[in-house]
Amino acid sequence: MANFRLNVLAYSVMLGLTAGVAYAAQPTNQPTNQPTNQNSNVSEQLEQINVSGSTENSDTKTPPKIAETVKTAKTLEREQANNIKDIVKYETGVTVVEAGRFGQSGFAIRGVDENRVAINIDGLRQAETLSSQGFKELFEGYGNFNNTRNGAEIETLKEVNITKGANSIKSGSGSLGGSVIYKTKDARDYLLNKDYYVSYKKGYATENNQSFNTLTLAGRYKKFDALVVTTRRNGHELENYDYKNADSLTQGKKREKADPYKIEQDSTLLKLSFNPTENHRFTLAADLYEHRSRGQDLSYTLKYQRSGNETPEVESRHTNDKTKRRNISFSYENFSQTPFWDTLKLTYSDQRIKTRARTDEYCDAGVTHCQGTENPTGLKLTNGKITRRNGTDLQFKEKGTAADGTKTYDFDTFIDTNNQEIVGKLNLGYANDTWYDCSLFDCKDGTKMKVFEGNATYGYIGKWRESELETEVLNGRKFARIKDRKDKNNRDNRKIKSILPSSPGYLERLWQERDLDTNTQQLNLDLTKDFKTWRVEHNLQYGSSYNTTMKRMVNRAGYDATDVQWWAKRTLGKSHNFFTGQDIVETCATTSSSAWNAFLCPRVDPEFSYLLPIKTKEKSVYLFDNVVITDYLSFDLGYRYDNIHYQPKYKHGVTPKLPDDIVKGLFIPLPDKPNSNQVKENVQQNIDYIAKQNKKYKAHSYSFASTIDPTSFLRLQLKYSKGFRAPTSDEMYFTFKHPDFTILPNTNLKPEIAKTKEIAFTLHNDDWGFISTSLFKTNYRDFIDLVHKGTRKFKVGKPGSEGEIEFDTFQNINRDSAVVKGIEINSKVFLGKMAKFMDGFNLSYKYTYQKGRMDGNIPMNAIQPKTMVYGLGYDHPSQKFGFNFYTTHVASKNPEDTYDIYAKDKNQTDTSIKWRSKSYTILDLIGYVQPIKNLTIRAGVYNLTNRKYITWDSARSIRSFGTSNVIDQSTGQGINRFYAPGRNYKMSVQFEF
């Protein structure tokens, strides 16, 4: 109730401040919807760039468009945005999806997220996640795939357009809950009044210890102009609350400190343009982006646990992830007015996106503390001979004197240089199996090696023996063995043994690298035409697009060794063929032991994949018309047609192979008692069966919006729009076969559909500001979901000795529908009209409340809790300094508004998610000062009161199963790892000329 009173109070204050607007100027209708691929003539375009480079909807006195927010470069600079999460920090109803070690993965808007919110950069759709629930069930909880949507470098962006609600007119497939559209900068943004521009910007943020440097160069020479924006960022993991005091030694799911990662990001934007005449413009552009993250998954639940340095470490999990995007484009613009267009733009783009997850399992505790290289006795090589750590001869515990007067020793008890006895830490190896590498050991003629001669073939009691070495060349290298390794009957002398450290002498490294590649070639034609029919104005935008996208997965894995020590085995040796009586020199190709020797026989497995490579062809045409009937009435009419064709492109022997076991016998049964060749043939037949299932989709999208200005201070906006999302290739074609979890492909899926209805009331005045209230409702249908299809019997076992067992089968189908309703308030009031001393001050308020349910009264987890943002801002009249003070309040996530999809599997009657976000209020203070014309200093304090809180998006990223992003579900230990940073700071300095 307190929150409700607060909302009413805020609304009343804003309403009162905007009430005296009866004498405002005549209104002008603004289009409520515009496609992303829009152009205008040269003068209009330059004017638009000028405006967008300095202001945005919420900064101007123009009322906002319905369900649309524009963030410009100036706003992003003012808010000190460093990543996509910062873009929507002070927006309500839009958040960023958290993806653990991989960072962020797209946006959540109006109850849906990731692939159901479109993301475009310069008209190009960005990489989509593998959204098949089957794939997520199998792989996502284990950190093996970088299954995220790629981001963008903030410093290269001219504008970010955020649309809430269905709107495929702008973005095509994927815009169910909304869209986020990025536009990159252009040289013309900076060269309005001069022929050059230079900027250097350096910043730092304490939340992740990130520093960044950005250099911007723009210039014009005769008919050419160019732009270069290059940015480099270096930082580490986001520091959760109480990061500096958290225990850094705890490992596993109970770890409370964020896992350590080194994060780097490089971005370069290049644009070169040629204007042969004022009506023609050619542009060649390159947008290069790479995000890298390297570190350790210390919260990984399968991490080998040790209590301290008293026990050697076996291995730990290291990560080396990467997201790389490269877009090369060429565009031609024509500004000659013709009966068919006022502006024309033709663009060809070649975009390649790679998201990579790499993990390396190896010990990094140092040679002394790693099990593979431990040498507690301190044995070393001194001038080619084995000695103690100080170079003296080896010593063992004396046991007595033999009958011949020689001393006997306990060769299991080593005497260190400090006279400490070390028991059981040496390896006494059979002399016949011990090969000394002559590049390390002294193998000269007559050289003798001190070895152990036991009293028996077993045990550790024996005496010293000096034996000559016998050299031999194996595979081009010289090795030596003890000459006395044979007895008088030429049998192995099991009493003679070598003395070496007990560890293998190298560290094993098991690595795997998994790539998701999305390569797109796209051709766009965009035209605009302004004309009148009678007294009705038309602002027409139309065009078409054609693109091909190849999406594939490539998995690599291998096994090798690092930190090789002097005692490591350097050869596989020889084996004796009893049939021929000959010794055979072993190689990695002939010995069975190679599978266990990472140093001598490292391996790289053949490339494989869990997905068929899919080529997608998309064709689309769109038409958008802003129809201005009078100064008081206008309409926006939009239509788009999409044709999408999926074609699997699998070539046997060329394409990375699908594992045999996940497809054999799946659709085409195995013959009775098949041999290995028949199994191989059956695998190919089943892959061919899936690969021949091409699929086509056709989609019609539309949008209708009306803007009515009954008075000079009141605006009414209505909107009705339809969006769609075609099934992704993995949702249709992903196949997996296992007794517990078999996934069948389904090429009969229908597109997901969203329809949005929205109405907005706005009070506005050029001098006072605006307050806008909107009500919305979005209906979703044909959500794609994974369902259990029953059991089927499949043959299992070795060829020729199979049996049949039942497999649980699952398949994606169109099932769920959903409804999301809500209310939003957006307002900004300029206080200068109230009193002269308040000139430059402004108040703002944003509020979003939404509620949604799927069929069966199931809550939608992607809906954010009730959120409000209060703002107080000031700008000096000459822009010498200014500040913004934001108060963000987020309500608790109620248990009845959450749904645990695994509750049934866990035999829980309570289907709510156990660990949720509580209500919190955050204060941020941001300011800037311009002491001289060419210098701007910005600084900010975030979470001013050092509040401990967790966002709902972080809380819902906690997985109830798997090995990554998990906590102790019973006690909650480990959840602090997901908390937001405490009080933190940002600062940047920018020089402009």
UniProtKB/Swiss-Prot annotation:
The keyword Transport applies. One of its GO terms (cellular component) is cell outer membrane. Keywords: Cell outer membrane, Membrane, Receptor, Repeat, Signal, TonB box, Transmembrane, Transmembrane beta strand, Transport. A motif (TonB C-terminal box) lies at residues 976-993. It holds the Pfam family Plug. Its main location: membrane. It is found in: Cell outer membrane. Residues 193-993 form the TBDR beta-barrel domain. Residues 58-185 form the TBDR plug domain. Residues 26-37 are annotated as: 3 X 4 AA tandem repeats of Q-P-T-N. It is a multi-pass membrane protein. NCBIfam families: TonB-hemlactrns. Acts as a receptor for hemoglobin of the human host and is required for heme uptake. This is Hemoglobin-binding protein C. It comes from Haemophilus influenzae. The lineage of its organism: Bacteria, Pseudomonadati, Pseudomonadota, Gammaproteobacteria, Pasteurellales.
